[in-house]
Amino acid sequence: MHSYDYWLILAFFAVVLLPAPFLGRFYYKVMEGQSTWLTPILGPVERGCYRIAGVNPQDEQSWQKYTLALLAFNLAGFLLLFAILLFQDHLPLNPQNLPGQEWTLAFNTAVSFMTNTNWQAYSGEASLSYLSQMVGLTVQNFVSAATGLAVLVALCRGIGRKSTKTLGNFWVDMTRATLYGLLPLCLLLALYLVWQGVPQTFAQYVNAVTMQGVDQVIPLGPAASQIAIKQLGTNGGGFFGVNSAHPFENPTAWSNLFEVASIILIPVALVFTFGHYVKDLRQSRAIIGCMLALFIIGGATSLWAEYQPNPALNNVTVEQAAPLEGKEARFGTTATVLWSVTTTAASNGSVNGMHDSLNPLSGMVALVNMMVGEVIFGGVGAGLYGMLLNVLIAVFLAGLMIGRTPEYLGKKLQAREVQLLVVTLLVMPVGVLVLGAIAASLPGPVAAVSNPGPHGFSQLLYAYTSASANNGSAFGGFGANTAFHNLMLGLGMLIGRFGYILPVLALAGSLAMKKTAPIGQNSFPTHGPLFVTLLTVTILLLGGLTFLPTLALGPIAEHLSMGF
């Protein structure tokens, strides 16, 4: 590693951690309807949205009504996007006259963007019109991120409130999350990316002739606006097929820094938002400490693995630097590793290099980041409500060990809460192991694998892990665009999204109705180093015990077979 690499890592943490506490407080004030510096500008727009939709912002909903509103909104978004993708050849803003998507691919894509997964079994510049990219995908990028934020806020209210049956109003939370929480930051990042060289145009693709006399088509489009939300909203779906490895999507070292940092900016800020909801920022610092510990462990392991020389070249008289296969030479090894760890620690899935070319242990780190449930920062809202589920599980385990009724911030965890927590523990195993096993047992789906042996198994395992974790990244050698995988991966995305959201909202409703007992000296503290350690071990054990056999068959076996 060179000095540039160390400065890159320091700059990354600075860009994320310095503004996060202030942004977290801003989100708390916004979601609770308090006045901010944006209120004079966006307040009239917000009130206009309520009048048009017939929503009274003072009316709050029970968790059941909140859930029904969320499901109805997401279903409508799915159907609209599905129709746009099917019939894009009959719609405007299609200068390349691209055909509509085949129905299983359209289903997969619509589910993918509705669930904030952004799994892409297609190449954007070769498959989608400008209208599909803007009105279809970009809109879903905003509302899927806002949905995650709304669910998190409902859970925060459930923990922070007492003796109430309401969690807020879904329509109000969605409006505020989009207007205040996402649009301003996305506007700033989009303008910055345009300055750095990312295209934002409705012009047709450019036909050029290379120096060798070969015709070449250079794709353009309204890319900057979509890239901004796909990073800040932890969506990850690229405007171009190779995502942020494309020079039009990520043209400079500065764009690379701000794009990778923006992946976890909002998830980190929302941890501080939670602290404001429960009126105890020590809880935020404990959760941030656990997230950082897991992130640094994974990052250090990945960096070490990627800087190891390839054993296949041991007997060749060449000087080996870090392997550069699948990496953008403009950015180098460290920038690629930092992105791969960040994009899988969050449920983002964007890439600036090819994960299929990572060394086995680096690929395993990416897998583990997703297998633990995308709780190491995670997606906008989704990451923190996933982490809070692990917090409650850790509190329950601590209560069992000391022989006391478990409680978190004065709320007792009883049978109903524990049952809901157990349901969430089944989401990743069902999505990854059950669906993945079905795919691995049939000859047709297995044909999508491009490599024999352990790496081929890792390709299939990565695909179903990514879908179930709502991440969206992939090992590029996996041929995902088949009817079977389009439908099965779409099912995995739905399980991974709503398998968490429904129990989380039920849990929020249950906790909101409870009284808050005063926290005394005999209460188990959830803000100190001991609890951070317990929480970290709980996350690793739950993920490790569940998925260790599959990891042994994939990346671990590949690592050993290569002779590292």
Curated annotation (Swiss-Prot):
Family statement drawn from the similarity comment of this UniProt entry: Belongs to the KdpA family.
Keyword annotations of the record: Cell inner membrane, Cell membrane, Ion transport, Membrane, Potassium, Potassium transport, Transmembrane, Transmembrane helix, Transport
Source species taxonomy: Bacteria, Pseudomonadati, Pseudomonadota, Gammaproteobacteria, Pseudomonadales
Quaternary context: The system is composed of three essential subunits: KdpA, KdpB and KdpC.
Location in the cell: Cell inner membrane
Coiled coil: none
GO function terms (MF aspect): P-type potassium transmembrane transporter activity; potassium ion binding
Transmembrane segment boundaries: 4-24, 67-87, 135-155, 179-199, 258-278, 286-306, 382-402, 420-440, 487-507, 528-548
Gene name, Swiss-Prot/TrEMBL: kdpA
Protein name: Potassium-transporting ATPase potassium-binding subunit
Protein's organism: Pseudomonas fluorescens (strain Pf0-1)
Job of this protein: Part of the high-affinity ATP-driven potassium transport (or Kdp) system, which catalyzes the hydrolysis of ATP coupled with the electrogenic transport of potassium into the cytoplasm. This subunit binds the periplasmic potassium ions and delivers the ions to the membrane domain of KdpB through an intramembrane tunnel.
Cited PANTHER family: POTASSIUM-TRANSPORTING ATPASE A CHAIN (PTHR30607), POTASSIUM-TRANSPORTING ATPASE POTASSIUM-BINDING SUBUNIT (PTHR30607:SF2)
Membrane topology: Multi-pass membrane protein
InterPro entries: KdpA
GO cellular component, one term: plasma membrane
